[in-house]
Amino acid sequence: MAGAIIENMSTKKLCIVGGILLVFQIVAFLVGGLIAPAPTTAVPYTAIKCVDVRKNHHKTRWLAPWGPNKCDKIRDIEEAIPREIEANDIVFSVHIPLPSMEMSPWFQFMLFILQLDIAFKLNNQIRENAEISMDVSLGYRDDMFSEWTEMAHERVPRKLKCTFTSPKTPEHEGRYYNCDVLPFMEIGSVAHKYYLLNIRLPVNEKKKINVGIGEIKDIRLVGIHQNGGFTKVWFAMKTFLTPSIFIIMVWYWRRITMMSRPPVLLEKVIFALGISMTFINIPVEWFSIGFDWTWMLLFGDIRQGIFYAMLLSFWIIFCGEHMMDQHERNHIAGYWKQVGPIAVGSFCLFIFDMCERGVQLTNPFYSIWTTDVGTELAMAFIIVAGICLCLYFLFLCFMVFQVFRNISGKQSSLPAMSKVRRLHYEGLIFRFKFLMLITLACAAMTVIFFIVSQVSEGHWKWGGVTVQVSSAFFTGIYGMWNLYVFALMFLYAPSHKNYGEDQSNGDLGVHSGEELQLTTTITHVDGPTEIYKLTRKEAQE
C-alpha cells in the first residue's frame, strides 16, 4: 500500500532532507546579508528657487537648477522682494539625480516624499485645514544637452498638517512649523538617466488658492530607489529559483497523474500553491531593464497577493483535511467559512492597490491619502481586510487545536498495537506534527525578521564583516517560502514504495479496526490513507 513520501520516509532520511533545506535557507540569508547591498537608498534633495519672469506661464518652460542652461536663481524669498519677483514667478526646481550622477533602470522605481520648511509670520499664519496646491511638471532626458521631454504635468493638492510649539508672538517670528512629511510621487520604472521637477505654487486670492499656507522658505524632497546591486542579486535569485520550483512542480503532478485515482483536494491545493510560487518567481523584471514598464510595481503586488492568498488557503485546507469526517473532506465547498475571509480580504487589498498604484500609472503624483474621502475609503478597505485576517487567524488556531486534540485522542489506541505497527504510526504522527511546527516556524521567522529589519540600523558589523539586515530579510524570507513550497511538493508527492503482502496482513495491518492514517493522500481507489484515519473525528463524536 503506497502513501505520501512523508509517510514512507524514515526519520533518518527526513532529517537529511531537512538538513539540506536548512543549508539552502542559510545560504539565502547569507546572499542578502553578505553579497547584496541595502535594498534601497534615500537621497535628499533641496529645491532650487528659479525665477520665471515670463508674462505667460501656460506654455511649459523647463527651468534646471544647474547644467548648460541653468536658470536664474534666488537664494531666499527675501531676495525676491527688492527684485519685484512675485510668488507666481518662483519655480522650485529639482534635478534628479544629483550632479555627476545618473539614474539607471536597475533602480526599478522612484518614490518621493515632500517636506516643507514653513516659517511663522504673524500676518501670514497657517490656517486650519490649510491645503497647498502645487503645479508640478516632470520631465526627462537621456543626455545633458538634449531638450527635456514632458512625462507628467498635474495640479497636486496636499493637506498641511503643521504645529507650532512656541507661543505665537512677534519674538518667535521666523521659527519653523513642525510639518508632517507628505507623499509626493511614485514611478514604477526608471527608464531614463535624468529627471527634472518644476514645482510652482500659484497664488490666487480670489479662489483662495495657496492662501493661508504660511511663508514657505524651502521645499525638500527625499527620493528613494532600489539599489542596483540588490536588484541584480534579486534577479539572480528569481532566475535560479524559477526552474527549481517548476521542475519539482512538474515532477509532483506527474506522480499524481500516474496514480489510478483522481487527485484529492489537498494534492490539488499543493499543486496550486506551486503554480502561485512559480508565478511569483518568473523573473519578468529582466524586461524592465530594456522597457519602460511603469506597471511592474502593481504587477508585483498582484503576484504576491495571489501567492499569499493561496498560502493562507492551503493552511486552512491542510488542517481541515486532517480533522474532518470522511464525507466532509475532499471538497472545497466545505471550507467556505474559512476561505471566505481570505477572498474578501484579498479583494479589499486588491481594490485598495488599484486605487493607489493603478491611478499612479497615469498620474505619478496621485495618492489616495491626500483627500478625506480617499483616506476614509482606504481605511475602510484596510479595516475590512484586517477583520478578515483576524477571523482567519481564529479559524486557523481553532482547526490546529482540533487536529492536535484528535491526534492525542487517537494515540491512546497505539499501545494495543504490535510493536512494528505502533512504531510506524508514531513516526507518522511525529512527521505530521513536525510539518505543522515547520509551518509555524516559517510564519514566526517572517514576522521576527520583518520587525528586526524595521528597528535595526540597516546593517550589523562584526569586525571587518558587514551584514545587511534588510537585504538578508528579503532574500532569506523569499528563499524560505520557496523551500517551504518545494518541501511540500516533495514530501506530499505519492510514494511508489509498497509494503509487502505479508506486512499488509501482519504487523502493519493486523485488524481493520486498527487502520490509522495521518495524511489525506488516498493510497488506493477504495479507501483513505493513513494519517486521515488517525486524525479524523468519528461521526458519533
From Swiss-Prot:
Keywords: Cell membrane, Cytoplasmic vesicle, Developmental protein, Endoplasmic reticulum, Endosome, Glycoprotein, Golgi apparatus, Membrane, Transmembrane, Transmembrane helix, Wnt signaling pathway. Induction: Up-regulated by WNT1. Transcriptionally activated by beta-catenin and by LEF/TCF-dependent transcription. N-glycosylated. One of its GO terms (cellular component) is Golgi membrane. GO terms for molecular function: mu-type opioid receptor binding; Wnt-protein binding. Residues 1-15, 254-268, 325-331, 402-431, 493-541 are cytoplasmic. Residues 37-232, 290-303, 353-380, 453-471 are lumenal. Expressed in the brain, skeletal muscle, heart muscle, lung, gut, liver, and kidney (at protein level). In the brain, expressed in the cortex, striatum, hippocampus and to a lesser extent in the cerebellum (at protein level). Expressed in kidney, lung, skin, intestine, brain, spinal cord, skeleton, eyes, excretion glands, tooth and palatal shelves. In the cerebellum, expressed in Purkinje cells. One of its GO terms (biological process) is Wnt signaling pathway. It is found in: Golgi apparatus membrane; Cytoplasmic vesicle membrane; Cell membrane; Endoplasmic reticulum membrane. It comes from the Eukaryota. It is a multi-pass membrane protein. Residues 101-232 are annotated as: Interaction with Wnt proteins. The chain crosses the membrane at residues 16-36, 233-253, 269-289, 304-324, 332-352, 381-401, 432-452, 472-492. Belongs to the wntless family. PANTHER family: INTEGRAL MEMBRANE PROTEIN GPR177 (PTHR13449), PROTEIN WNTLESS HOMOLOG (PTHR13449:SF2). Interacts with WNT3A. Interacts with WNT1, WNT3 and WNT5. This is Protein wntless homolog. The gene is Wls.
